[in-house]
Amino acid sequence: MQAIKCVVVGDGAVGKTCLLISYTTNAFPGEYIPTVFDNYSANVMVDAKPINLGLWDTAGQEDYDRLRPLSYPQTDVFLICFSLVNPASFENVRAKWYPEVRHHCPSTPIILVGTKLDLRDDKNTIEKLRDKKLAPITYPQGLAMAKEIGAVKYLECSALTQKGLKTVFDEAIRSVLCPVLQPKSKRKCALL
């Protein structure tokens, strides 16, 4: 069985842990718990191939900036996550997460993931953002960011409703099984 290592990065509280727990257990967790490193492993079938998907959670908080890259070696695919209802987390894709991932892993495929899709149309959430003169991130904005950072895909999902959730991980696996660019290199992340 082929093993694939998928590392999930992004700002604190964008929903990385919920994404993983909801996907691996089919249940949405309750309270917000900051993460250091939780690893999940799931055996899945994608395109009739059995895959052992190793899912690595990371902490987005700045306190972990020096620890986090320790989980990057041998990564096959990165999910860079931001919350669709947190414009600052979206900006940090460009300002922090893309540069960090590319510094350590120059050619590992990236999938850009907009989380909390269920809240984009939530009246209370929209009002709170409007009070700060902000708005939820739109699909075209996400697509443009994915293009800018050279992500292989842009996907949106909700860990709460599970809409688009399975697709995120299926596409992560496909990006490794059917690489779009540089098929000759092994595309593994190395620590120099």
From Swiss-Prot:
<keyword id="KW-0547">Nucleotide-binding</keyword>
<dbReference type="InterPro" id="IPR027417">
    <property type="entry name" value="P-loop_NTPase"/>
</dbReference>
<dbReference type="GO" id="GO:0030866">
    <property type="term" value="P:cortical actin cytoskeleton organization"/>
</dbReference>
<dbReference type="GO" id="GO:0007391">
    <property type="term" value="P:dorsal closure"/>
</dbReference>
<keyword id="KW-0342">GTP-binding</keyword>
<dbReference type="GO" id="GO:0016203">
    <property type="term" value="P:muscle attachment"/>
</dbReference>
<dbReference type="GO" id="GO:0016358">
    <property type="term" value="P:dendrite development"/>
</dbReference>
<dbReference type="GO" id="GO:0007422">
    <property type="term" value="P:peripheral nervous system development"/>
</dbReference>
<dbReference type="GO" id="GO:0030036">
    <property type="term" value="P:actin cytoskeleton organization"/>
</dbReference>
<feature type="modified residue" description="Cysteine methyl ester">
    <location>
        <position position="189"/>
    </location>
</feature>
<dbReference type="GO" id="GO:0005525">
    <property type="term" value="F:GTP binding"/>
</dbReference>
<dbReference type="GO" id="GO:0048814">
    <property type="term" value="P:regulation of dendrite morphogenesis"/>
</dbReference>
<keyword id="KW-0449">Lipoprotein</keyword>
<dbReference type="GO" id="GO:0090303">
    <property type="term" value="P:positive regulation of wound healing"/>
</dbReference>
<feature type="short sequence motif" description="Effector region">
    <location>
        <begin position="32"/>
        <end position="40"/>
    </location>
</feature>
<dbReference type="GO" id="GO:0046330">
    <property type="term" value="P:positive regulation of JNK cascade"/>
</dbReference>
<dbReference type="GO" id="GO:0032956">
    <property type="term" value="P:regulation of actin cytoskeleton organization"/>
</dbReference>
<dbReference type="GO" id="GO:0007254">
    <property type="term" value="P:JNK cascade"/>
</dbReference>
<dbReference type="GO" id="GO:0042995">
    <property type="term" value="C:cell projection"/>
</dbReference>
<dbReference type="GO" id="GO:0007516">
    <property type="term" value="P:hemocyte development"/>
</dbReference>
<dbReference type="GO" id="GO:0031410">
    <property type="term" value="C:cytoplasmic vesicle"/>
</dbReference>
<dbReference type="GO" id="GO:0016601">
    <property type="term" value="P:Rac protein signal transduction"/>
</dbReference>
<keyword id="KW-0472">Membrane</keyword>
<feature type="lipid moiety-binding region" description="S-geranylgeranyl cysteine">
    <location>
        <position position="189"/>
    </location>
</feature>
<dbReference type="GO" id="GO:0007413">
    <property type="term" value="P:axonal fasciculation"/>
</dbReference>
<dbReference type="InterPro" id="IPR005225">
    <property type="entry name" value="Small_GTP-bd"/>
</dbReference>
<keyword id="KW-0636">Prenylation</keyword>
<dbReference type="InterPro" id="IPR001806">
    <property type="entry name" value="Small_GTPase"/>
</dbReference>
<dbReference type="GO" id="GO:0007613">
    <property type="term" value="P:memory"/>
</dbReference>
<dbReference type="GO" id="GO:0007163">
    <property type="term" value="P:establishment or maintenance of cell polarity"/>
</dbReference>
<dbReference type="GO" id="GO:0008347">
    <property type="term" value="P:glial cell migration"/>
</dbReference>
<feature type="binding site">
    <location>
        <begin position="57"/>
        <end position="61"/>
    </location>
    <ligand>
        <name>GTP</name>
    </ligand>
</feature>
<dbReference type="GO" id="GO:0035099">
    <property type="term" value="P:hemocyte migration"/>
</dbReference>
<keyword id="KW-1003">Cell membrane</keyword>
<dbReference type="GO" id="GO:0035011">
    <property type="term" value="P:melanotic encapsulation of foreign target"/>
</dbReference>
<dbReference type="GO" id="GO:0005886">
    <property type="term" value="C:plasma membrane"/>
</dbReference>
<dbReference type="GO" id="GO:0007015">
    <property type="term" value="P:actin filament organization"/>
</dbReference>
<keyword id="KW-0581">Phagocytosis</keyword>
<dbReference type="GO" id="GO:0051450">
    <property type="term" value="P:myoblast proliferation"/>
</dbReference>
<dbReference type="Pfam" id="PF00071">
    <property type="entry name" value="Ras"/>
</dbReference>
<dbReference type="GO" id="GO:0030030">
    <property type="term" value="P:cell projection organization"/>
</dbReference>
<dbReference type="GO" id="GO:0030865">
    <property type="term" value="P:cortical cytoskeleton organization"/>
</dbReference>
